[in-house]
Each structure stands twice: as C-alpha cells, then as structure tokens.
Amino acid sequence: MVRSDENSLGLIGSMSLQGGGVVGKIKTTATTGPTRRALSTINKNITEAPSYPYAVNKRSVSERDGICNKPPVHRPVTRKFAAQLADHKPHIRDEETKKPDSVSSEEPETIIIDVDESDKEGGDSNEPMFVQHTEAMLEEIEQMEKEIEMEDADKEEEPVIDIDACDKNNPLAAVEYIHDMHTFYKNFEKLSCVPPNYMDNQQDLNERMRGILIDWLIEVHYKFELMEETLYLTINVIDRFLAVHQIVRKKLQLVGVTALLLACKYEEVSVPVVDDLILISDKAYSRREVLDMEKLMANTLQFNFSLPTPYVFMKRFLKAAQSDKKLEILSFFMIELCLVEYEMLEYLPSKLAASAIYTAQCTLKGFEEWSKTCEFHTGYNEKQLLACARKMVAFHHKAGTGKLTGVHRKYNTSKFCHAARTEPAGFLI
C-alpha cells in the first residue's frame, strides 16, 4: 500500500498540544519530484484553515509550569484531523514570530475547565443553602424598599386640589380674596388666645368651675337653637375676660350669661331678650346686673369681638377635606369636647380645628389619613396634629361619663346622627 507523500515526516513537523493550544510547524524540502503534488497546495490547506482559539486554562502559575514540562504528544496531521480542527475554529500561534494572528482577536475566546480541578474542589457547584436564603432575603428587602419608594413617590405626586374651583361663580364665596382672609386669620389668631394658665390669677375660681359653666352654656345654646358661631364667640369672650379681670365665684354664671348676650348681638339676627337669659339662670340675677356686667365686659375687651375662633377655620378646613355630613358633624363633636377642657387653651384655634378634622377622619376610616390638600390649606402636617388628636381621642373615650356630659347628650341625638356613639380612634393613642 502506497503511503501518501503528504503525511511524510519530512514534510510536516511534529504537532504539539500543550495546555489545549495547538502549535504546528511546517517544513518544506528542497527536492520535489515531478509526480508529487505541489507542497504549496498541502501547506495552503493547513495554513489557511480557520484560526485556532486560545485555550484558557484555570490553573495557577505553578500548575501551568508543571503541564508545560510534560512531554508533548506527537500526532500526524491527517486531512481528517485537520478538518476536525477547522470545525472547532482553531487559532494558530506562530512560534517564530511570537505575534498573535490579527484575525484571532475578533473571535470569541474559548474557556476550558479542567475536570481534575473541579474534582479537587469537591465536584459540587451548587451554592450552600444559607447563601440562597440570604439572596432571597435581600431580594425581598429590595422589593419592599421599591414599594416604599413608590408609595412615597405617590404621596409626593399627590396633587393639591383647588377647593374653590366650584365656587368661582358664587359671589358669596368671595373666591377672589378668601385666601387673603384666612391668611389674615392665621396671622391674628394669637390675639384671640389667652394664657393657658390664666386661672392661676383667679383666687375664687378654678378650671373645674369653668368646665361646668361652658358645659351648661353648650346646652343653653342648643336649646335656644343659636348659630354655631355664637357658641365659639361666647367661650372666647369668657376666657378673654377672666384672663384680665378678677371675679368671685357667685358671679361666674352671670359672666357666662352676659357673654352669651354679647355674642348673640354680634352674630345672631334675632337676639334673645334679657328676661329669657335671666329665666334660664333660675332668676339668680336681675336685669340691672346683666346690663351692668355687659358694660363691664365690653369695656374690658375694648369692644373687640372680631377675632378668629376655631369655627372660621373649621369651615375652611372641612372644605379642604372634602367632607360629607358625617365627617362634619363628628369634627364639630370633637372640637366641642375641647371647648369644655381647660387644658386645650394651649392650642391655637387653627390647630384645634385641624386636629378635630384629622381625628374625625381617623375615627371614621379606621386609619390615619391627612391629604396634601388638607396639609396645604391648614398649614399643619400629620405629625404636628398627633399630640392634640390623642387628647381628643381621650376626651371621646370619657365623653359619656362623669358630670360634664352636655356635649355627649347633644351629639347623641338624631339631629346629629348619633355621632357620640362612634367608636373612638384608639389606635392614635
């Protein structure tokens, strides 16, 4: 059997595979017979084959040196073996020039993983269970943080509603200057406030007596069917007068009746007659005493009855809260509970009104709610109202107990939708 000249060792040098790399050297002879195929054809078939890839071996330097010291494997390059190398897209590294093939830089590198090395590492590529649990927990935390950020973004993007848009054609709403009016109220509301400890200057009175008087006046106001503004102005006149004038205990009810008369003259269209006020006082005072006290109180207050009370803020803030009838009634129930309590004098009228609406919203909905529109128009955020709201919830809890139950009985009627029976928002405390 004739052996092909192209497989002669005189034509093709040894091929060595070191570290997965293929290194070939082609040697031509000077003498070539006329019957033999041109060596250029064979060399062309070998040298023009696709470039061999570099074999990346994941071994340390010492291990690579050990492999390089192994004797090379000699194998003749047949056409079949050359075709296999061509299918694997090999890369030729020229040992003579020591320069990489320019085409090889565009080919993706092939990574060869040593089986022996995998066996040394244990042969198990699965990660420990605690690592998987940690990654799951981290993913869950990241998901929760994304949800919180989305919720915060939704809150930040919540638009402020134009609450006066529906009243632009209503001349009584005074849309053109309603904002200026309430800005004025906010700037001057401190003038309507009294020191929260003014009762210390009264030698014959205490805060419990004040509470009894106001609780009784709330019932009188309800029986006479007077306007809501009248009640708030009456209590404001009483506190401002007692803060600057000493009074004896037996004249306290006279101060209350006279303050109601002054408020009615300022707010009401039809004013109760003096005799009716004397009658509800069980005729404890004469007509002359009522008129004399009226002069004294008006002069002491310098006839100043145009100060903002919680009522003017309540109407505006309820509009900002887009309230319904139920929320409105419950809000007034909350703030009237505060009128009886002496300790609530420390809060500004606007803050009392905002806290009452906030507490009523939480009571009805069962969770904390304070919209951007409410925050914009009231000037108070949820955190600023929380302390006052907690006190209102405490008053709500005890509204039906004790001796001062006038507000509870008033709002436990069908006229006020039995608002006093509403379950208090205990989660705020």
UniProtKB/Swiss-Prot annotation:
A biological process from GO: mitotic cell cycle phase transition
Q: Which UniProt keywords apply?
A: Cell cycle, Cell division, Cyclin
Segment Disordered: which positions? 86-109
SMART domains annotated for this entry?
A: CYCLIN (SM00385), Cyclin_C (SM01332)
The highest taxon in the source lineage is Eukaryota
Q: Which InterPro entries does the record match to this protein? A: Cyclin, Cyclin-like_dom, Cyclin-like_sf, Cyclin_A/B-like, Cyclin_C-dom, Cyclin_N, Cyclins_cyclin-box
According to the UniProt entry, its GO molecular function terms are: cyclin-dependent protein serine/threonine kinase regulator activity
Q: Which Gene3D superfamilies match?
A: Cyclin-like
Compositionally biased residues, Basic and acidic residues: 86-101
User: Which Pfam families does the record associate with it?
Assistant: Cyclin_C (PF02984), Cyclin_N (PF00134)
The UniProt family comment states: Belongs to the cyclin family. Cyclin AB subfamily.
Official protein name in the record: Cyclin-B2-3
Q: Give the source species.
A: Arabidopsis thaliana (Mouse-ear cress)
